[in-house]
Each structure stands twice: as structure tokens, then as C-alpha cells.
Amino acid sequence: MSDMRRVLPLLAAVVCLASASAVPLRVPPVRERAARPHAALAQPPVLANLSGLAHTVEVSITAAPARLSLVPGTTSEVFAYNGHVPGPTLDVHEGDHVIVHFRNALPEPTTVHWHGLHIPAGADGSPLDPVMPGQRHDYVFDVAPGTAGTYWYHPHPDRRAGYQVAMGLFGAIVVRSPDDPLPASIPEKLLVLSDNRFRADGSIDFPDSQSAQAEMDAENGREGNVLLVNGQLAPTVDIQAGEMQRWRIINASAARIYRLAIPGQQLLELGHGAGLLGKPLRMQDILLANSQRVELLVRGAGAPGSAVALQTLPYDRYDPHTRPADWNQTHDLLSLRVTGVARDSSVRVPDSLRPVPAIDTTHVAEHRVLVLTQGMINGKMMDLTRVDFTGRLHTTEIWEIENLVGMDHPFHLHGFRFQVLDRDGVPEPFPYWLDTVNVPPHSSVRIVVRFEDFAGKWMYHCHILDHEDMGMMGILQLH
């Protein structure tokens, strides 16, 4: 169903809870923007390159309070990168030297974590390196060869990541390759998925840390009553009949796992996680866990004037004892509207996209076991002064991640991409690159990772942000 009955309720039955996390904000006037349902999908602006040098990208990002219209008829006090939610896109190429001049104009410490990028620990933006209010910090790194794909950036302060992301701090990263296998003529769309909990007046409902709702959020993860795409409610994407579009989709939600589908169509999956797959896959639906990204080819199907919805189907990620009553609903995210007939619908998708060699497991330096429970890894909560594992550069490790509880835990390793070996002992059918893997309830996933470079301290954690903030995180020290 493509009407508003399948969009999450905007204003009905919203519990108005006081927010102890709220801080006094000095916010500018409301910035005009389309906040009406079914408006054309807007693309986030691209960060302007301030450098005049070849293969150098120099940009400026400020995190600051702002007022935006996200829910129709209301305004919301948010945190925003350069005044936008989502923030501007960092668009770079493999091999680029990147300089980010960051300014923290928030009333609290923050960081910028470049999720999925293979960069030095000092540039990672972990909670070990907070940027205090009023301070500036330069993040400097090189974009690694062979890492073309879709990534994102978001804050990672100690115990406050969930709050700051909920307030609006997230943006996309696109890494391009000179040998992209897809024709440059294919139109490209960026879709940043988020959800939030809004009160009737448009204010963001982030509950008091001592409230019953906060306790439930810490258990389940905080899901919203409004789903947004690029900060818009139920936008529309126009496509011509027979036209193909390349969609880069990012799950920027704190806890919601999306199960993406377009009724009556197969999805042609090009990439999942840290770059393209070895070959395209045809899928009926695609599971996108927190912080994961997917690249799709979508074809305009149907007669001009017809429309279908990109939907998120029901997915039970919850503990049976705390599962919300409405978990099994289908929600429309956007409308795909056929506007005409494509002049050229003969675009050919290559059978092979790029080589993805399997990581060699002949010589494995360490086999580690990480046991995930509620709020803890291996029975411990996060301590920024403690190193949980020590490893060596130029080695390969296998990690077995065991989830002992009744809900999903998306597991993220900073700084390094990895490959899945098997799930509950069943071998993965082919290698591909990830930086976050979903671990379902009462299951185990084995991953293999090669630590070739970049010494330092690296975080690993559950990417349900409420769990991360609760302490479901550890530190790997590489020498």
C-alpha cells in the first residue's frame, strides 16, 4: 500500500517525556526546506573542495545546533553538520589525500568517526579522542586503494553517540574508483535512512535517562515513530520506464534494521558493506543492519504514471520478552514514480564487478572468541582505560562472535574490513568485504581480518547505539 496509512504515525500516540539529555541550545532561525510528504527526494549537498591540488580533498565541517523542519508543520531543534540533516556528502576517490577541518560548535564533546574507512587510528574519531566544545580538530587521512564504495560519518563520543546521532549528526561518504565497472551514464541516488521519535510539536523525544522508556531503549535500542529518507518524510523518486538508477543506501538508524523490498521487483544488489561484490546478486529483499550500506540497481517498471514503494518489511530483531507490539508492520520509505519512457534502456550490467580475493587463512596468528550478551562483550563493559585484546601488525586473525541473547547484535570493527567465514558453521558462499556484520540471536559468526598496517587502539562494538553507549564495546591494541 503506497498511501500514508503505511507511513509510521507522525503525531498520534506519542508519549511526551521530558529529556534530561536536552541541553540549552542557541539555535538560528528555521532554515526553509521541503518537509511535506511525497516531495521530490533531495540529495544531500556535497562538501566543497577547498584545495586546488590534484588528488587532495580539503573540506570544512561544523557540528552545531540548528532548527529544521523535518516533520510537516513543525520545526525541530537538532544538531547538524553544516546546517544539514543528513550532513553534506564527502565525495572522494581512491588515493585522495583528505583534510577535514572540523569545528565543534555543540555544547558538549563530540568526534567524527569515518565509518568503514581504512585510515590511521589517530584519524578514526573514536571516543579516545574527543573534540571539546568550541575546539577545532583536523582529521587527515588517505583514501585506501581498492576501497571504492559507500560509507558514512557520525559522532562517536563516550556514552553519547546515540543521542548525537538522534539529534541529527550523520552524513554519507562516497569513495569512487577510476575503474568503476558500471557505466557513468547510470543516474545515481543517495538514500540515507533514519528514524526518530518526535513529539507532537516536532521536538525530538529523547527520554530521561532514569525513565522507564530509557530503560526499554537501553534494552531494545531506540526506534522512532517517524521514518525519514535524506531527512524527508515519504519522498518521491522519479524514474522513466526502462531506466536504471544506482542507489546507494545507508542505514543511519540507531537501532532499526531495515528489510528492503520493492513489491513486484527483484533488487539487483551490487555491493554490501565495504564496497562492491564480486558479481551482482538478484534479491527479493535485502537486510540492512545498523550502519550497513548497500548499492542497488533499480529499474523503472510499469507504465508512465504508475508508482511503487520502497518498503521496509517486518524483521524480528527483538528479544521476545521486550518485543514491541507493532514490530510486524510494513512501512513505505519512498515512492518510485514512473514519469515517462527512457530513451535508452539498453544499459548492460556486467557479469563481474570486481575481484574479491578471499583472505588467506593458512597462517592465523590468533583465534579469538567474543561473547555478546546484554550490554557486555566477554562479560565486561567498556572501559576506555583498558585494552581488551592485543594484536600484531602483518598478521591474520579469526574472530568467532557468539550472540548468547535473544536479539540481534550488529558487530562493527573500526579501521579494518573483514570477510565472513561461516555462520553457525555454514560456510559463506563467496568472499565479500564488511566492516559490520549482523549476529542474530543465539548464533555465531566467524570472521577473518588481516591487520596489515595502522598500529594503535581500535574499537569494536555493537552498533545498536544504545548498546554501544551502555558499554557494549572493547579495545584492540595493535603493535
Model-derived features with residue positions:
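Active-site pocket scaffolds in enzymes
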Residues: 70-72, 114-116, 122-127, 131-133, ...
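Short, conserved beta-strand segments of beta-strand-rich sandwich/propeller modules, principally
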Residues: 99, 150-152, 246, 307-309, ...
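Short, surface-exposed loop/turn segments at beta-strand-coil junctions that are enriched for proline
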Residues: 142-148, 299-305, 450-457
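Terminal connector regions
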Residues: 111, 158-164, 168, 303-337, ...
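Sec-dependent signal peptide recognition
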Residues: 5-10
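A conserved active-site cap/scaffold subdomain adjacent to cofactor or substrate pockets
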Residues: 242-244, 250-251, 290-319
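Histidine-centered copper-binding motifs that mark active-site loops
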Residues: 23-289, 296-297, 332-374, 445, ...
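Bacterial N-terminal signal peptides
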Residues: 11-18
